[in-house]
Amino acid sequence: MQSNGKRIAIVTGSALGLGYELARQLIAEGWFVAGVDFNAERQAELEGEFGAGSYKAFVGDVSDEAFVNASIAEIAGLGHVDLLINNAGQPSFKTPAAYEAADVDKCLKGLKGMILWSVATLRADGETDLKIANVMSTAATRGNANESVYCATKWGEKGYTQSLKAAYKGTSVKIVGVYPGGIDTAFYRDSHDYVSEEKQHTFMDPAQLAGVILFNLVNDANLTVSDILIERNYV
């Protein structure tokens, strides 16, 4: 695995949907992407699609500390990590009384993974010259019916993001909170008990969304867009 002098980005949840588009568009702009996902079959496909000089797949659970640390050690061997995009997460849409412990554990994997990948990358970079973008949801900005556990997780992610901003204010570590609304991916398409098919056309295209996010994240301007709130059009 070689980065060939390219800027290095880590994208968690890179196999499908928004994560895939973020990885694809970064690679198109000349980045080397370390993609993290539990979908081994899809990860193998992406290594073939992008090539070893642009993409390295790491297959595992983002909330597994041993996996995180081993992966970061390998990635750091290539050079300084410039960008970490914590994108991985899983949904759980149910009425409040229908939730079980397994649903809570599933949602919390995203929060735990965000923390572990941030900590490990910060350590590897010596807490310098790093941008961390935490992709959450508009569910981190309000409470939604039938999303109580999901919202609780996203609010936790927002709290972590805000705390990182406070800790690294005035340094070369930049923290960005990303809050997108509904995206037209399997994340919602597989949840038609909650999201009606009639509303699906109003959800955001992941390629367009990734372009908007990266336009704000990756540029040569002497500024940082600290929060990116992106709502879908409801028509």
Language model features: what each stretch is:
Residues 177, 197-235:
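C-terminal helical subdomain
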Residues 69, 90-103, 146-149, 188:
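Conserved mid-core segment of classical short-chain dehydrogenase/reductases
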Residues 29-45:
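Conserved glycine-rich Rossmann-like NAD(P)H-binding loop of the short-chain dehydrogenase/reductase
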Residues 73, 77, 101, 109-129, ...:
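Amphipathic alpha-helical dimer-interface segment in Rossmann-like NAD(P)H-dependent oxidoreductases
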Residues 137:
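Residue(s) in the substrate-gating loop at a strand-loop-helix junction
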Residues 118, 153-154:
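Active-site helix of classical SDR
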Residues 15-16:
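Conserved glycine-rich cofactor-binding loop
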Residues 90, 97-116, 133, 157:
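Catalytic Tyr-X3-Lys loop
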